[in-house]
C-alpha cells in the first residue's frame, strides 16, 4: 500500500504568560516516536515568518512535522490527538490575542501553498488572502481552531507548511527543554562552559555568547519552557556543542529542528524605494541624503534616497556597533540598507529599521581653505570678489591666489557591517555565515539522532 505524505503545522500554542509552540510539538513528538514509530521525512521544521508584521506571535515562528502515514484515517487520528493534547496544554493559559491553530496538508505541496510560504517570510499576508488560498486547496487541507473564531494562526500554520526549504538556505537548532518544576526559576546553565563551547565550535555555531556584555545568548529570559537553544550549520556539531555545556538541572526533552533562522530569508532585494512597502523586509541600494543624527534613547536616524524618493533609516541603540558606524555616514555615500519597513506615525514617516549595512562607496569629504601667505605663513583673507587674497599679518597680496582644495580622510571604509550580537533577531544572518549558504535539501530523508527523552536517544 502506498503511503501518504502529511505536513502538520502548529502555530501560536503559547502566550506571553507561558507555554511554547516548539515545546508542545517536542512533547507530542516524543509520544509519537516512542509509541507510534512515526515515520518522519524531514527534521521537525521551525519556520520563522516575517518579524515585521503587527500581529505576530512571540518569535513569529511556526512548527511543521512532515511524515508518512498508511492512510487518510491515520492522519486524521493524529490530528485529533494533537488537538486534544493542545487543548490540555493551553488549559492553564488564556490570552485575548491568542490564535492557536493546528493544520494539516495531505500530499505533495502545490505551487500555490509554496508561494504563500515564500511570501509570508518577507511580506504581509492578510487573513482574507490566506482564506482564498485555502479555499483553492480545500481538498488537501484540514485544520482545527483551538479558540473559537480565532483564525489568524492559519497564516502561520499553512505558510510554514508551504516553506519547504528544499531549495533555500537553512540552519539547525538544538533546543533543550526544562522540567515543569524548574520553570520560572533561574536557568542552571554554566556561562563559562558556554564561552568555552563557543571558542571550540565558533565556526559552525551561531551567536552563542556576547563578548561585549559578557553573557550567554543561548539561554532565553522569562518563564517559558526552553532551557537553551544552540544554533548552527549541522546537527552533529550541535550535539557535540550541547555536550560541552554544563547544565545543573534536568533536561527531559531535547530536539533538533531544521530552520530558516539566520538566513536573511525575510529580506527581499528591491529595485527602488517605491517598492519599500510597510512591514516588508527589504534590501535596497541607495545614497545617504542627510547627516545622521542621534535622537533621544540613543537611536541614530538618517535619510537615504534612490534618486527620486526618500526614506528614513533607523539604527537603534541596541544595535551597538552598527549604530556607531551609521553615525559616520555622510550625504553622497552609496550604501545598501537591509531591514524591515516600519509604518509612519505622527512623528515620522515610513522608516527602515536597520539590520545590516553594506557600504559600497564612501564619498570623499572636500574642504576648501584660504591659501597661506608665502611670506609669513599666516592664513590669507579674501581681498574682494575677483581680487585674490591678502595677508592680514604682513599685508602681502596675490590677485591670482585661489582656495586650496583639501581632501579629508574618512574614518569609514567600504564593507559589510552588522549589529552587536545581542541585537540579532531570529532571521538575521551574521556576516560569518556569508559563503555558508545551502541551497538543496532532499524532498524525503528520514532524520536520525534528533530527539532525546530523559537523556535517551529515541529511534
UniProtKB/Swiss-Prot annotation:
Residues 282-360 bind DNA. The keyword Ligase applies. Transmembrane segments: none annotated. Keywords: ATP-binding, Cytoplasm, Ligase, Nucleotide-binding, tRNA processing. Its EC number is 6.3.4.22. GO terms for molecular function: ATP binding; ligase activity, forming carbon-nitrogen bonds; nucleic acid binding. It catalyses: cytidine(34) in tRNA(Ile2) + agmatine + ATP + H2O = 2-agmatinylcytidine(34) in tRNA(Ile2) + AMP + 2 phosphate + 2 H(+). One of its GO terms (biological process) is tRNA wobble cytosine modification. It is found in: Cytoplasm. It is an enzyme of class 6 (ligase). GO terms for cellular component: cytoplasm. InterPro entries: NA-bd_OB_tRNA, TiaS-like_TCKD, TiaS_FLD, tRNA_Ile2__agm2C_synt, Zn_ribbon_TiaS. Disulfide bonds: none annotated. Belongs to the TiaS family. ATP-dependent agmatine transferase that catalyzes the formation of 2-agmatinylcytidine (agm2C) at the wobble position (C34) of tRNA(Ile2), converting the codon specificity from AUG to AUA. PANTHER family: DUF1743 DOMAIN-CONTAINING PROTEIN, TRNA(ILE2) 2-AGMATINYLCYTIDINE SYNTHETASE TIAS. This is tRNA(Ile2) 2-agmatinylcytidine synthetase TiaS. The lineage of its organism: Archaea, Thermoproteota, Thermoprotei, Desulfurococcales, Desulfurococcaceae.
Amino acid at each position: 500500500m502506498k503511503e501518504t505524505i502529511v505536513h502538520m503545522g502548529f502555530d501560536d500554542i503559547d502566550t506571553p504568560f507561558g507555554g511554547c509552540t516548539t515545546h508542545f510539538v517536542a512533547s507530542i513528538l516524543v509520544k509519537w516516536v516512542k509509541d507510534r514509530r512515526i515515520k518522519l521525512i524531514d527534521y521537525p521544521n521551525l519556520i520563522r515568518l516575517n518579524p515585521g508584521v503587527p500581529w505576530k506571535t512571540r518569535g513569529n515562528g511556526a512548527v511543521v512535522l512532515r511524515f508518512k502515514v498508511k492512510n487518510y484515517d491515520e492522519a486524521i487520528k493524529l490530528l485529533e490527538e494533537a488537538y486534544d493534547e493542545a487543548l490540555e496544554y493551553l488549559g492553564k493559559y488564556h490570552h485575548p490575542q491568542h490564535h492557536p491553530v493546528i493544520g494539516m496538508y495531505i500530499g505533495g505541496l502545490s505551487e500555490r501553498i509554496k508561494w504563500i510560504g515564500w511570501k509570508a517570510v518577507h511580506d504581509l499576508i492578510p487573513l482574507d488572502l490566506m482564506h482564498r488560498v485555502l479555499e483553492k486547496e480545500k481538498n488537501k487541507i484540514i485544520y482545527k481552531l483551538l479558540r473559537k473564531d480565532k483564525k489568524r494562526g492559519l497564516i502561520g500554520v499553512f505558510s510554514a507548511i508551504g516553506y519547504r526549504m528544499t531549495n533555500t538556505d537553512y540552519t539547525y537548532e538544538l533546543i533543550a527543554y526544562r522540567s515543569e518544576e524548574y520553570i520560572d526559576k533561574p536557568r542552571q546553565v554554566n556561562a563559562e562552559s558556554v564561552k568555552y563551547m563557543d571558542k571550540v565550535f565558533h565556526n559552525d555555531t551561531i551567536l552563542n555568547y556576547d563578548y561585549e556584555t559578557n553573557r550567554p545568548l543561548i539561554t532565553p529570559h522569562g518563564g517559558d519552557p526552553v532551557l537553551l537553544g544552540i544554533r548552527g550549520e549541522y546537527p552533529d556539531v550541535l550535539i557535540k556543542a550541547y555536550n560541552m555545556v554544563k547544565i545543573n538541572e534536568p533536561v527531559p526533552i531535547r530536539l533538533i529542528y531544521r530552520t530558516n533562522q539566520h538566513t536573511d530569508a525575510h529580506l527581499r532585494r528591491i529595485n527602488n524605494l517605491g517598492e519599500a512597502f510597510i512591514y516588508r523586509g527589504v534590501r535596497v541600494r541607495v545614497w545617504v541624503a542627510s547627516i545622521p543624527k542621534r535622537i533621544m534613547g540613543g537611536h541614530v536616524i538618517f535619510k537615504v534616497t534612490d534618486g527620486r524618493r526618500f526614506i528614513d533609516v533607523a539604527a537603534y541603540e541596541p544595535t551597538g556597533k552598527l549604530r556607531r558606524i551609521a553615525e559616520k555616514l555622510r550625504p553622497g555615500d552609496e550604501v545598501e540598507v537591509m531591514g524591515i519597513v516600519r509604518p509612519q506615525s505622527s512623528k515620522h514617516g515610513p522608516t527602515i529599521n536597520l539590520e545590516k549595512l553594506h557600504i559600497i562607496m564612501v564619498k570623499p569629504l572636500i574642504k576648501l581653505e584660504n591659501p597661506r601667505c608665502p611670506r609669513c605663513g599666516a592664513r590669507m583673507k579674501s581681498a574682494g570678489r575677483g581680487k585674490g587674497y591678502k595677508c592680514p599679518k604682513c599685508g602681502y597680496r596675490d590677485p591670482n591666489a585661489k582656495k586650496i582644495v583639501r581632501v579629508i580622510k574618512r574614518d569609514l571604509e567600504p564593507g559589510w557591517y552588522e549589529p552587536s550580537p545581542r541585537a540579532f533577531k531570529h532571521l538575521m544572518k551574521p556576516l560569518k555565515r556569508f559563503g555558508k549558504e545551502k541551497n538543496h535539501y532532499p524532498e524525503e530523508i528520514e532524520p536520525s539522532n534528533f530527539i532525546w527523552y530523559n537523556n535517551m536517544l529515541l529511534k
